[in-house]
Amino acid sequence: MKKTDIVLAVAAVGAILYFYLGSSGGQESAHSDVKNDLTAKMVLLLGRDSGGSAAVQGKADVKDSPYFKKVDVYNLKSGGSLLLLEKYKTYQQHTEYTCGPAAALTVVQHFLGNAPDSEMEIAKIMGTHPAGVKDPGTNTRGMSRYFEKKGWTVKNSLKHGSPETYEDFIKFVDDNLKQGVPIMVENVDWGGHWRVIIGHDTMGDSNGMNDVLIVADPYDTTDHSHDGYNIISATRFYYMWFDAHLFREKEKERQWLTAVPPGYDSGKKK
């Protein structure tokens, strides 16, 4: 049997299993781990996923790009008009659908130095799904679940609301960064994508329109420097802070979460 035939056969079996498990009513929770594990393994083992940003590391880099200035974000210092979580380690996702787990992994690294769980271990706890499955990607509930299971203190848009104005958003960002807390955010980038806000620069004035955000991006392939950092317009992000088609209708607007480990002392991160 050809490899393509095997792939199609297993995919068909997977679809049947998903239909059966997904239509079992009250038994849904009992089968959720089976579905999550099945769909993840099908994608990873059968080649239905291109391997995410990690699979093309450096291939889109352009040395001395005339269009994008190279900034050594890792070695930037916070001060003046710039609020920054210094030495923030980035990470590139290994599938096309695990931006949420990959973003969360960087937050764990930020606080603990190393992440005790792998990207796919985090994805399993979060209930992360590939495209074509109910609730694809990782929603805010799933993102929060991982940290809550670890005993971390979690705040999110579902329980605490979201900034209603751009000015409130900037204050929200600054308040967290001053406490050494990165902000995981999901917006319409790539149709729906989790990144982590780790910096904000007012550019030295109160204009607001020229403010920039520095984000850790687990799919960093579009600025000619595959270092895991993006520098983006704060206003542009705020007005594009919604999900395109992945999340449920009531969870599409301005999704975010923060998480800090037990006993976290913000004074140590300032």
PLM features: residue spans?
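Ser/Thr/Pro/Gly-rich low-complexity linker/stalk segments immediately outside membranes or between
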Residues: S24-L38
